[in-house]
């Protein structure tokens, strides 16, 4: 009977260690995904190579390559090109009717969260703003600690 009790206690101890390990691993994963620390480059690379659209991506770092004229047809969009190693040059269309204009300059580093749409020129990053209806998760542009959403 003592041997049976020993195995029950040993099993309980191992189970407790396993639960603790899973809990700690989950916390470490959450810590990795804090803004500016987690990069969704792989998701974007896969979307580009598979020519997929409507792909939401987490905050990812880019460099402003070129500022373009605003798109003023329909909803107004601040437009600019960004670069990132491992990706083609991408167009960003940031809706300035829903979010503030970001003060950008070429060569500047920024973080973008939004949605990728494939096209033959590489693709467009958009939904870099809140969703006024609260249906989509929404995104942002982030310069330093300042978010434009």
Question: For each predicted feature, which ranges?
Answer:
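OB-fold and OB-like single-stranded nucleic-acid-recognition modules
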Residues: 3-149
């Amino acid at each position: 009977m003592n041997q049976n009790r020993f195995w029950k206690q040993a099993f309980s101890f191992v189970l407790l260690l396993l639960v603790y390990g899973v809990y700690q691993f989950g916390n470490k994963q959450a810590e990795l995904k804090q803004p500016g620390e987690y990069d969704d480059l792989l998701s974007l690379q896969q979307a580009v190579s598979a020519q997929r659209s409507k792909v939401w991506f987490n905050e990812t770092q880019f460099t402003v390559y070129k500022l373009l004229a605003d798109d003023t047809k329909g909803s107004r969009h601040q437009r600019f090109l960004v670069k990132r190693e491992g990706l083609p040059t991408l167009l960003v269309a940031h809706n300035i009717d829903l979010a503030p204009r970001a003060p950008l300059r070429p060569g500047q580093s920024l973080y973008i969260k939004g949605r990728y749409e494939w096209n033959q020129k590489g693709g467009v990053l958009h939904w870099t703003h809140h969703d006024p209806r609260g249906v989509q998760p929404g995104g942002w542009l982030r310069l330093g600690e300042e978010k434009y959403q």
